[in-house]
C-alpha cells in the first residue's frame, strides 16, 4: 500500500465516522503497522454510532477537523484533506460513493437489532449529515 492510498483510506474512515455518528474515534482507535518495510493504516475497528445513544454529546468527531469538532460542513473535510495532499475531487468522489450506498445503509439499519426509535434516529442522522456533505 502506498502512503497516498493510506491517507485516502484514512480520510474515508473520517467521513464514515462523521456520517455514522461515531464521535468516539480518538487516537487510540487509529494505528499503523509495518507488515514488510512500509507502514500502513491498520483495519478500522470500534466503529459504532455513539451519537444516537448519547445525544447530550454535541461533538460530531472525537478529534478536531479543520480546528472543529462540531458543526462540520463539507468545506472542513475538503480543507483537512487538502492538508493531507488529497484534492477536492477525491473528497467529492468519496462523498458521492457514500451517498450511493445510502439505500444499503437503510436496509442494514432496518434489519439490525436496534429499537425502531433508534433505527429512525440513526437514519435521520446519516441523512442529515449526508445533506451537509452534499451541500444541501
Give, region by region, the residue ranges found by the protein language model:
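Anionic ligand-binding catalytic core segments
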Residues: 1-136
Amino acid at each position: 500500500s502506498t502512503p497516498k492510498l493510506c491517507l485516502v483510506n484514512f480520510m474515508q474512515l473520517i467521513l464514515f465516522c462523521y456520517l455514522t455518528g461515531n464521535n468516539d474515534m480518538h487516537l487510540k482507535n487509529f494505528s499503523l503497522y509495518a507488515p514488510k518495510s512500509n507502514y500502513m493504516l491498520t483495519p478500522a475497528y470500534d466503529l459504532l454510532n455513539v451519537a444516537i445513544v448519547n445525544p447530550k454529546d454535541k461533538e460530531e468527531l472525537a478529534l478536531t477537523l479543520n480546528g472543529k469538532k462540531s458543526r462540520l460542513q463539507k468545506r472542513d473535510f475538503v480543507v483537512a484533506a487538502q492538508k493531507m495532499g488529497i484534492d477536492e475531487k477525491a473528497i467529492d468522489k468519496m462523498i458521492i460513493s457514500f451517498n450511493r450506498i445510502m439505500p444499503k445503509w437503510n436496509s442494514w439499519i432496518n434489519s439490525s437489532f436496534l429499537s425502531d426509535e433508534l433505527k429512525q434516529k440513526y437514519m435521520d442522522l446519516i441523512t442529515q449529515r449526508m445533506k451537509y456533505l452534499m451541500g444541501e
